[in-house]
Amino acid sequence: IARGTYIYPPRPSMRLFRDTLVFCRQHLPKLNVNSIGGYHIREAGATRIQDLAFSLANGCAYLQAGVDAGLDIDDFAPMFTFNAFGGSMEMYHEIAFQRAARRMWARLVKERFGAKDPHGMMIRQPITAHIGCTSTTLQRPLNNVARAVVGGIAAGMCGGLPAAYPPFDEPLGLGHSLEAIQLQMDATRILIFEAKVADVVDPWAGSYFMESLTDETEAAAQAEFDKIDAMGGAVAAIENGYMPRAVAKSAYERQKRIESQEEFMVGVNCFNGDNELDVSVQRVVEALYDPQQMATAEERQLATLAELRRDRGGKAVAGALAGLEVHAKDDGANLMPDLIECVKSDATLQEICDVLRGVFGEAEPVKI
């Protein structure tokens, strides 16, 4: 939908997910096979409601793939996680978002798929409410400490770990400084051990305001989910371009709100000054990458690859790749054993992907 790291079209990609899920349930039953995430969707511009609806629609597609493969919902739903939804500075709305998400996922797993194990009805995620990296600013980066604390408070008030995330120098580039890491860690510790934000799981329960806001969030997200469902589900809504276009449109509309000062970002489009603090930070390492190593990285990697191809058994590689191609053309076959055989024979990732490209084709970007 938003990340752009996919190779194959949606349906072959779901086939690969199905094969992975079935194989892992048979051979690695305690492995968390899938981590559903709306974080990158919101970071790309989706609204809060789209984030929730699209994420749950994706989750529904994954659950359906497992059921269609003959798995019992109670055998695999408890092994699903959500790595994170998106976030924003609107603390009350993000608390309501998390409360609504828990309701909707539980109802989906129980009522649509008939689950009986309550573990499968829980949303398990390492990060609950947070501000998201798009809430941090390059201008006046120290303000991001205050922003992250707001996210940490929201997380603690919706039953999560009150992590003051991300570090304040997130917008300055990859690799956090020593100062930013310490401030982020200590802000989280202050929220937990001094402010005791995490002492109560759901302190807003029963509040007319919060319960109403949760209901409104749930109703809006459910309506969007139902719209996607009517299209045929998440896969169809990606294929017809609905979800990618909706994200792009929302991103454009938010940018217009920021530029028109309908939405405020302190130090960016309001409360600006002529005298700005010069923030210098001490990096964990002087350079993220050794410049000399970077200059020769491609050459060294090509040499390593040439050595691998020279020393491996060519017939074994060809046989493994041929087997993968045959089974890729059979939708009823599970590709995991073939993929494992390819790796054991020292087939390269490019060679494996090229075989699957020949069968599945490549995903084409949606025209926005």
Where are these regions (language model features)?
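Catalytic alpha/beta active-site cores
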Residues: I1-H93, R112-K116, M121-T128, P162-P166, ...
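Conserved structured core elements
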Residues: R11-R18, L28, I49-C60, D74-P78, ...
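Phosphate/diphosphate-binding loops
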Residues: G4-C24, R102, R140-G151, A180, ...
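Generic beta-strand/beta-sheet core signal
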Residues: N34-Y39, N83-G87, P126-G132, A148, ...
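Mobile "lid/hinge" segments at catalytic clefts and subdomain interfaces of large enzymes
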Residues: F17-L71, A146-F225
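Flexible, glycine-rich loop/tail regions that form catalytic "lids" or insertion modules at the edges
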Residues: R189, F193-I368
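Glycine-rich anion/phosphate-binding loop at the beta-strand->alpha-helix junction
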Residues: L56-G59, F82-Q184
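Short acidic, glycine/serine/threonine-rich loops at helix termini
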Residues: I1-P10, G37-D51, M91-F97, S135-L142, ...
